[in-house]
Amino acid sequence: MALNIENIIAEIKEASILELNDLVKAIEEEFGVTAAAPVAAAGAAGGEEAAAKDSFDIELTAGGDKKVAVIKVVREITGEGLKEAKGLVDNAPSVLKEGVAAAEAEELKAKLEEAGATVTLK
């Protein structure tokens, strides 16, 4: 019996929500698994996780008054061209870089703030 993944996906796309719910329940029973995410474990470690966060997203929240200086720093950080960097500054808030190490994130935040931007680390 050969399974055609595309046919299975097409059938799932056409199924109603009730049918999909029944499918999930049947899979859970057949294979002894659960589709629920482990929410309780993540909630218990939430405070510790925030303190021990090791990667950050750098979000430009406002370009500030010195847009030219900010655009130069944004170009340096992102490697984008002038037009793209200007677009990021003009359309703030925008994420400039994702998954940056804590030390590098602080360094880049300081550079941007020195140029006149308002920055948030998330």
From Swiss-Prot:
Keywords: Ribonucleoprotein, Ribosomal protein. GO terms for biological process: translation. The keyword Cytoplasm does not apply. GO terms for cellular component: cytosolic large ribosomal subunit. InterPro entries: Ribosomal_bL12, Ribosomal_bL12_C, Ribosomal_bL12_C/ClpS-like, Ribosomal_bL12_oligo, Ribosomal_bL12_oligo_N_sf. It comes from the Bacteria. HAMAP family: Ribosomal_bL12 (MF_00368). Belongs to the bacterial ribosomal protein bL12 family. Homodimer. Part of the ribosomal stalk of the 50S ribosomal subunit. Forms a multimeric L10(L12)X complex, where L10 forms an elongated spine to which 2 to 4 L12 dimers bind in a sequential fashion. Binds GTP-bound translation factors. This is Large ribosomal subunit protein bL12. It comes from Streptococcus mutans serotype c (strain ATCC 700610 / UA159).
